[in-house]
A protein has these predicted regions:
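Transmembrane helix-loop-helix
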Residues: 1, 80-138
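Intramembrane alpha-helical segments
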Residues: 1-22
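Hydrophobic alpha-helical transmembrane segments of polytopic
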Residues: 12, 34-37, 74-81, 85, ...
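Helix-coil boundary and interhelical linker segments in multi-pass alpha-helical membrane proteins
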Residues: 15-38, 88-105, 151-157
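Final/C-terminal transmembrane alpha-helix of multipass membrane proteins
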Residues: 134-155
């Protein structure tokens, strides 16, 4: 079902939240923010895979894309969730997420990384080529890894 990614995004976003809760014994705004960062990231990531590998998914009887096809509505949703993934990731800079914080250097790094994610999503939106879906998938993996490292190093330094 096209709902598979949405349903899977919920347990897929738990690890960061659970890590925070295990370390602090508190389900606070920090844990919720980490959950939302991971939750919104999953849509462009998995839908880009579904886009690029749509023939294989169709042969297996899976409908990965939200509309069931590679169309403007699907690519617009990918772009929408990419923007939200970035926006949620910069919220800690504004000091409203408790102990989860970002310095000016951290937020600038995430904005730059986020620009790559959004640009990759926009490229897919413009032309719908599998090549751009593959680039977005790779960009999404790099984005998530580097924002996690940004939060880690920003806290250390």
């Amino acid at each position: 079902s096209p709902l598979a990614v949405f349903i899977g995004a919920i347990p897929g976003a738990f690890p960061f939240m659970i890590g925070w809760v295990a370390a602090t014994n508190d389900i606070g705004i920090e844990a919720i923010t980490l959950f939302l960062m991971q939750f919104f990231w999953q849509f462009p990531h998995f839908w880009s895979i579904g886009w690029a590998q749509s023939i294989d998914y169709e042969k297996a009887g899976f409908k990965m894309l939200p509309t069931g096809k590679k169309d403007k509505s699907t690519s617009a949703q990918i772009l929408f969730y990419s923007v939200w993934a970035v926006l949620i990731s910069i919220v800690p800079y504004f000091g409203i997420t408790g102990e989860l914080k970002l310095s000016i250097f951290g937020v600038l790094a995430i904005i730059i990384l986020g620009a790559f994610l959004i640009f990759s999503s926009y490229a897919l939106f413009l032309d719908g080529k599998n090549e751009n879906a593959n680039k977005l998938m790779l960009t999404s993996v790099i984005y998530l890894t580097l924002i996690q490292l940004t939060f880690l190093f920003d806290k250390i330094f």
